[in-house]
Amino acid sequence: SGVHKPDEGEIIVEGKKTVFDSPRDALDMGIATVYQDLALVSLMSVTRNFFMGREPMKGFGPFKTFDVKKANSIASERMGQIGIDVRDPSQAVGTMSGGERQCLAISRAIYFGAKVLILDEPTSALGVHQASVVLKYIVKAASSGLGVILITHNVHHAYPVGNSFTILNRGKSMGTFNKKDLSREKLLGMMAGGEELDKLE
């Protein structure tokens, strides 16, 4: 996502080899990362968190001011599109559930032009219902044409929404597999280090 330079390999974006010097470079190329901590401010409103420094303005020149009405309308509409009813967009984000906050962060990234979403453990701290809401939105985002990279240790969340899987073990790739070639049980065994355990027996 631009924070670290790769030790090896290449990053190809739309057929061109690309080097990111910062997260801003990645964002400019349409690659957005939603981190596990979400980068949300609990005491700020839903709208303020949605725009976070990119608020719509009204007026001219030095007399520009934050267009609160437009911002509230956009935030409510975008959240509504994913099935989350924000009755009052001025409410503090801290009053929302974990799943709603996760969807807010993802919806924000998409609104600002993300072509590829990198999601870092988006369901790790969520209950069953909240996790299902987030996973449904991930499927919806992927179906709309976005590229989605879901980073998770939970095979029960990864398998239903994934098309291909890259398995990492201690920082090394164990391979990339298409869903049609890999059962849920096989994926679970590889993630749990099952193949290494088999070699010890």
For the regions a protein language model found, what residue spans apply to each?
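Glycine-rich phosphate-binding loops of nucleotide-dependent enzymes
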Residues: 1-201
